[in-house]
Amino acid sequence: LEHSLSVTRLCDKISGNYEFLNRDLLISCAMLHDVGKVKELSEFPRNDYTDEGNFLGHIVMGYEMVMEKIKNIPDFPPIIANEMGHCILSHHGELEYGSPKKPAIAEAVALSMADNIDAKLETLRECFEAKDTNDWLGFNRWLESNIRRTSF
């Protein structure tokens, strides 16, 4: 939930800087981009992947959940449904990162980048909290870099 809120805040800032972005679409998709995780993961305290989560993943599951809700909204514009679906399906940005599609519209690019920014900075924050030092913290496989805290 904190991640989705952070991504939404980033997208709000981005939309204010790039006026050609459809802010309503971007913010809606930012709030919903990881909704599939509620079905992908089991309940606390187990927090393990469900069978459906292992088979489909949160991206596909989230897309299906959102599309199902949209079907129940009378006269929902099909183009907006397609754009929302695309943003959700492409939010990891690359096929090798689990997205079934690469971003093809500006809002999908912005969402993918905001998601990536938040995930990477959160990873750094966790590394910094784990070791209270200004020394090099070692190689982080996800960030693909040897990291250290800024000296300030």
Residue ranges and their predicted role:
Residues 125-143:
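Compositionally biased, low-complexity linear motifs
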